[in-house]
Regions:
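Beta-strand-rich cores of mature extracytoplasmic or soluble domains
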Residues: 93-200
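Short N-terminal edge-element motif at the start of the domain
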Residues: 2-79
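Compact, well-ordered interaction domains used in eukaryotic information-processing assemblies
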Residues: 62-67, 72-99, 105-109, 115
Length: 200
């Protein structure tokens, strides 16, 4: 797109009448306009989730994980805020990470489970391990310890390890959670999974 046409679009639609005094990266501006028009979720986007007791929490979209059905990887921050609080995105991302999980961020927006809050390109480390078991599911009340675990990093090769080595005990559960299940985890700090196997 011609830069002069782009400037005219910005003037007409965004009220930027004196572009000489505004420093911006043209490609970034075009990307933001395009993704906004397409309702696309950008890496670094931060979302607000209303949780019980008149509190709210935040998570950040990290990237897609080709190793798990191209699911959206999010990192959920630990702190809960009062409904009247207005933290900056810098304050939010400096918080401790509660968990990483896979979900469908755009679907959660459409369902009204969370709302866009802001964006920061700092998405933290992607050197995060996930784990999943091949024998998911058991009868109510039955305690299953799996010896069929697979582990992987975001967009990395999946590695079958059998009995889960201790070094992967802290790996996050690698399932593609529905937006409703993700919202439950963010709200209550636990997964709503009755039949997921244990590792020991």
């Amino acid at each position: 797109m011609d830069a002069r046409i782009t400037e005219q679009i910005l003037i007409n639609n965004y009220g930027l009448e004196n572009l000489d005094n505004i420093k911006f990266n043209l490609s970034e501006v075009l990307e933001l306009i395009w993704n906004k028009a397409m309702n696309r979720v950008l890496s670094g986007n931060i979302f607000e989730v209303i949780v019980p007791n008149d509190q709210k929490r935040y998570f950040q979209y990290v990237c897609k994980d080709l190793s798990l059905l191209n699911g959206d990887v999010i990192r959920v921050f630990s702190r809960s805020y009062a409904m009247t609080a207005s933290p900056t995105v810098e304050e939010i991302i400096c918080d401790e990470v509660d968990c990483y999980m896979h979900t469908a961020v755009g679907a959660g927006v459409k369902f009204g489970l969370w709302t866009y809050y802001g964006r920061n390109k700092n998405v933290g480390s992607k050197e995060v391990y996930f784990r999943d078991a091949n024998d998911y599911g058991h009868y109510p009340g039955e305690r299953i310890v799996s010896h069929n675990w697979t582990v992987w990093k975001i967009n990395g090769e999946r590695k079958y390890v059998g009995t889960l080595p201790e070094e992967y005990y802290s790996a996050y559960i690698g399932l593609l959670f529905s937006p409703f299940s993700a919202a439950y985890r963010i709200s209550y700090g636990r997964y709503k999974m009755l039949y997921y196997p244990l590792y020991r």
